[in-house]
């Protein structure tokens, strides 16, 4: 089964917790802190595997959670970094953040990789908090939470040339006669329901990959029929071969077909109109084809070059292939996405940390709820089993301006304050 779009959940591993420990060595009084740092959590890394052709595997496994880092140990020993979780994807996979719509990666070549969810850093052990005024601190951090997000995977086939047109205009037949591909061919619409790829040899030491894309109908750009499912595969092609049925057996006007398909391409993605398009008048072996072709030429004008062919008899096919090969030699790759720079993704939730660091709301029972990436991250990294860590967290809240903001919202001694699922009393 061909699957070209799927939604999955990914989570980087949490960092390991730092440790509170002290040196216990004979004849060394007050040996000092010796708690090690936690190890970094594993990243979730997507890697291109050229043998894969579909996203089918992701229908059965939709959650990918990387391992956390090892906790810090005594004697100043740091925890081990967790091994990255490798997720293999087929060439042509685009990874998109489901919440923001941001393109995280466009994975094309074998072995290409991208970090999709970063692991959290390890928490610091108590040796990191030693100061002249506090030489033996009882403070250690929990590991930083790993990045988590829902992502959309879209597979856009890798082909140099895309065959487009209405259903049953002869796209699959054309692909079958110019390559070794064997797409399903039958006398009914939408026989082709998945893209078929074939390698075309022109006979003069040139070759290219051609994709037979399922037929389009009016409204495809808005999802009519299987519109979006098909149109996304055209985006990677460099040359579009527009196949038109000149026989008239379907009862449609060839010129109206031509206008409709071009409009669908334009409405779906305006950049598709930048690609060179070769217009193919197919089924020229049929009785009324020549008459229909002349009428078509009068309507499109002399600017549009038309290649009359018969995919069944192979009439005109050789000239068509040479024209396509010539166009490919002068047509560059078209970038289909603006992929986020590495600098944009190297800091977790960078967009959320810019601007307001926290938000305060009040529930119907009077409870103050504090939310925001910075405060929630600080909360998760605090070890509340140790008094010094609790006092440090209180100082951090004051430093962020949360105490002052709560007073401004009317908070008084004894009022309940909630962060995530935890509640505590406000002390003024």
Swiss-Prot record:
Major enzyme class: hydrolase
Keywords assigned: Cytoplasm, GTP-binding, Hydrolase, Magnesium, Metal-binding, Nucleotide-binding
Location in the cell: Cytoplasm
Domain OBG-type G: 159-329
Name of this protein: GTPase Obg
A GO biological process held by the record: ribosome biogenesis
Gene Ontology cellular component terms for the protein in this record: cytoplasm
Signal peptide range in chain numbering: none
EC number: 3.6.5.-
Self-association state and partner proteins as the record states: Monomer.
Pfam families: DUF1967, GTP1_OBG, MMR_HSR1
Superkingdom to which the source organism belongs: Bacteria
PANTHER family noted in UniProt: DEVELOPMENTALLY REGULATED GTP-BINDING PROTEIN-RELATED, MITOCHONDRIAL RIBOSOME-ASSOCIATED GTPASE 2
Requisite cofactors: Mg(2+)
Region annotation (Disordered) ranges: 117-145
Similarity remark: Belongs to the TRAFAC class OBG-HflX-like GTPase superfamily. OBG GTPase family.
All residue ranges annotated as the Obg domain in the record: 1-158
GO terms, molecular function: GTP binding; GTPase activity; magnesium ion binding
Residues binding GTP, per UniProt: 165-172, 190-194, 212-215, 282-285, 310-312
Binding site residues for Mg(2+): 172, 192
Species: Bacillus cereus (strain ATCC 10987 / NRS 248)
Domain OCT: 350-428
General function of this protein: An essential GTPase which binds GTP, GDP and possibly (p)ppGpp with moderate affinity, with high nucleotide exchange rates and a fairly low GTP hydrolysis rate. Plays a role in control of the cell cycle, stress response, ribosome biogenesis and in those bacteria that undergo differentiation, in morphogenesis control.
Major subcellular location class: cytoplasm
């Amino acid at each position: 089964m061909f699957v070209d779009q799927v939604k999955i959940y990914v989570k980087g591993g949490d960092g390991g917790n730092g440790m509170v420990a002290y040196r216990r060595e004979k004849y060394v009084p007050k040996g000092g802190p010796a708690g090690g740092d936690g190890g970094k959590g594993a990243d979730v890394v997507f890697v291109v595997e050229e043998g894969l052709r579909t996203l089918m595997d992701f229908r059965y496994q939709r959650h990918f959670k990387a391992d956390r880092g090892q906790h810090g140990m005594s004697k100043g020993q740091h925890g081990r970094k967790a091994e990255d979780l490798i997720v293999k994807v087929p060439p042509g996979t685009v990874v998109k953040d489901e919440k923001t719509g941001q393109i995280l990666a466009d994975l094309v070549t074998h072995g290409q990789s991208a970090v999709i969810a970063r692991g959290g850093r390890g928490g610091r052990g108590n040796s990191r908090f030693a100061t002249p005024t506090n030489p033996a601190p009882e403070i250690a951090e929990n590991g930083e939470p790993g990045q988590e997000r829902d992502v959309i995977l879209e597979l856009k086939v890798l082909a140099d040339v895309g065959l487009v047109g209405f259903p049953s205009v002869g796209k699959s037949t054309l692909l079958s006669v110019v390559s070794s591909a064997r797409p399903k061919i039958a006398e009914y619409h939408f026989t082709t329901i998945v893209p078929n790829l074939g390698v075309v040899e022109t006979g003069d030491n040139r070759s290219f990959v051609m994709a037979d894309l399922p037929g389009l109908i009016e409204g495809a750009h808005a999802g009519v029929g299987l519109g979006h499912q098909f149109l996304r595969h055209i985006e990677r092609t460099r040359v579009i071969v527009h196949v038109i049925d000149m026989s008239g057996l379907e009862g449609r006007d060839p010129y109206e077909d031509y206008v409709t398909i071009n409009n669908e391409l334009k409405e779906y993605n305006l950049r598709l109109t930048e690609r060179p398009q070769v217009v193919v008048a197919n089924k020229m072996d049929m009785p009324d084809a020549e008459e229909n072709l002349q009428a078509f030429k009068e309507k499109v004008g002399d600017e549009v070059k038309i290649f009359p062919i018969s995919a069944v008899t192979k009439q005109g096919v050789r000239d068509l292939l040479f024209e396509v090969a010539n166009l490919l030699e002068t047509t560059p790759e078209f970038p289909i996405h603006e992929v986020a720079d590495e600098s944009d993704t190297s800091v977790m939730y960078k967009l959320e940390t810019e601007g307001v660091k926290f938000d305060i709301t009040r529930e119907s029972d009077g409870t103050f709820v504090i939310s925001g990436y910075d405060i929630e991250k600080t909360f998760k990294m605090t070890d509340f089993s140790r008094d010094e860590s609790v006092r440090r967290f209180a100082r951090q809240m004051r430093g962020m301006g949360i105490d002052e903001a709560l007073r401004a919202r009317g908070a008084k001694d004894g009022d309940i304050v909630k962060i995530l699922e935890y509640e505590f009393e406000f002390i003024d």
